[in-house]
């Protein structure tokens, strides 16, 4: 495979030698600690890493002269006796451990975080719209690349109420208690969100300690504290949060929220502040870097591979395979009689040549538009059904099934449909008036319809009525096809894997057991084979990959023997899983590979280009798509192979990145032109969507999932 190469700058800056430790030092906790002692939190506070949980050994990026370290446990400061084990030159430490120790060195010894906080506040002023404030905060990590250590530097945004929390609740403790369970930020460090768990009695001494911490650690002056928070109220209650033991004072905190909770006008105004092109974001990051003393201020230039725009396969009217390079013209024949007709590559047997009972559900607030709505629906379904009659596609039988519904009376329309329902797979097209505040404006209606085995798709009339060129109609049809399990296209060439599986974990209810996650199984053609919920052995238990493999083979009857299998997952392989995976690969005589794909990461590429990928250190930087306001790359952090009882770490390369790019095209829920495919490969994208649907209490229909129906999208 030959890929073109391009060069772009990324947000990586070489760390100066004087800010990198020469040696690291190993210690062990000597004294007894109680069961409440949080070993991870203790080591992380001092910028180190755990080596062995059992014998309480850890490593620090600096030498400790005093053999007693302090551990804060609520109100108490506990002395922890430690003993020295050995020292080791940093160059002899594994890169993934060394990176974290260099980060800990910058954090604990050189106090990089308060310095970044001061710099970003000077460079990027906050924005206020009505009572909502958006401000920027920095984040960072350390990566080793070609023998040098680099600081990966980025900034994000957080939105909060302008008033501090104590004023927001009108200095009323009872009202503050109503916000237990809500998210807050600690004003001097807005990048971390905390969840209020307890509102306690006032404690002036703790208020003084919090103030002292702000002044000493974050380098705020007393005048800055007063100008930001006003006169300090020493009689305010103390709060505790789920994430850490330290107390909080509401006067130093702000209530935060999610973007979908905002009024649309406020959201639009704030988006103009935080939606930046990659080039503009790069300029701001460079400004921050120039003021940071730990690094060279020139960003790293990196060579990227430009992925090939490989074709997809559909079928022509003679059912012969034909190539396409984008999917946005698949249904042009609905509106243009001269357009080429494309047929799907695979139709599930359970709906093949079926007449689907179809309901047209119209929001009663747009009943005056009935004539125009009927024209749109008739044109789409009549033209579609003409073609479907000559193929294996299902037909939509919607005659005399036009109904009005009210969003205030979902029960009424469900009751009406239920009275004439025949217990077969049906379809409903929901035509709505407007987008309501909840994420999916007709989610309740769609879920209740699906309880009756009616798969549905919604569209806003306000948008559809303006669709003169048929783009929205085309998109609507592919969404309907995907929900009905129709695989309209496949990859042009087979992959080297028998199965490519996307794995995501989460919470949901399945039967009488807790569902721990979902695996979406694609075959070698890039086609969805099935969607499989995974039950956990016990409620709340984390899913381990070896258990998932056994579950797929034993409970889901997927043949895993003598196969070449690729797992894509959003998360790391735990050490405890590795030995089991080696054993399973030996028992099954199968090659099992796992790639960790991280959507949330700190990398930024200073370009609007897309369809590109590179390797930095041991990370893959993967940027398959574009957006109008700056695309975030995906990080490929680990690629492991388990074969015949052996484990091998693989290096991210051109071939695997090209395959992952090809899989971003396998989007059965939207039509896009080149460059507007999925951000992550389809198997893990749909696994994530299914887990989110479980969290919203969508019903699980195993029969439909076996055929790859995306009814939950």
From Swiss-Prot:
Mid domain: annotated span: 346-488
Q: What class of enzyme is it?
A: hydrolase
- PAZ domain location is 164-257
The name under which this protein is listed is Protein argonaute
Question: PROSITE patterns of this UniProt entry?
Answer: PAZ, PIWI
The listed outcome for residue 479 to A is: Decreased guide-dependent cleavage of tDNA
Q: Which gene encodes it?
A: ago
What is stated as this protein's family in its record? Answer: Belongs to the argonaute family. Long pAgo subfamily.
The EC number(s) given in the record are 3.1.24.-
GO BP term, pick one = defense response to virus
Q: Which cofactor does it need?
A: a divalent metal cation
**Would I find Nuclease among this entry's keywords?**
yes
Q: What is the effect of changing residue 246 to A?
A: Nearly complete loss of guide-independent plasmid cleavage. Loss of guide-dependent cleavage of tDNA
What is the recorded phenotype of mutating residue 442 to A? Alters binding kinetics of gDNA, probably due to loss of Mid domain binding to 5'-end of gDNA
Identify the Gene3D superfamilies for this entry: 3.40.50.2300, Ribonuclease H-like superfamily/Ribonuclease H
UniProt keyword terms in alphabetical order: Antiviral defense, DNA-binding, Endonuclease, Hydrolase, Manganese, Metal-binding, Nuclease
Mutation effect (residue 217 to A)? Significantly reduced guide-independent plasmid cleavage. Decreased guide-dependent cleavage of tDNA
Q: How does activity depend on temperature?
A: Optimum temperature is over 75 degrees Celsius for DNA cleavage, DNA-binding occurs below that.
Activity regulation summary:
DNA cleavage is inhibited by EDTA.
Chain sites annotated for binding Mn(2+) 3: 713
Q: Note how many cofactor molecules are bound and how.
A: Also liganded by DNA. Cleavage probaby requires 2 divalent metal cations.
Induced by what?
A: Constitutively expressed (at protein level).
**Domain Piwi: from-to ranges:** 426-699
User: Lineage, please?
Assistant: Archaea, Methanobacteriati, Methanobacteriota, Methanomada group, Methanococci
Q: Identify the residue position(s) of the site Interacts with gDNA.
A: 107, 157, 191, 217, 479, 669
Q: Which GO terms describe its molecular function?
A: DNA binding; DNA endonuclease activity; metal ion binding; RNA binding
What the protein does comes down to: A DNA-guided ssDNA endonuclease that may play a role in defense against invading genetic elements. Uses short ssDNA sequences as guides (gDNA) to bind complementary target strands, resulting in slicing of the target DNA (tDNA). Endonucleolytically cleaves tDNA (the gDNA indicates where to cleave); two major and two minor products are seen which correspond to cleavage sites between nucleotides 9/10, 10/11, 13/14, and 14/15 downstream of the target residue base-paired with the 5'-end of the gDNA. Efficient guide-dependent tDNA cleavage requires a minimal length of 15 bp and is maximal at 19 bp.
Q: By its UniProt entry, which Pfam families does this protein fall under?
A: Ago_PAZ_arc, MjAgo_N-like, Piwi
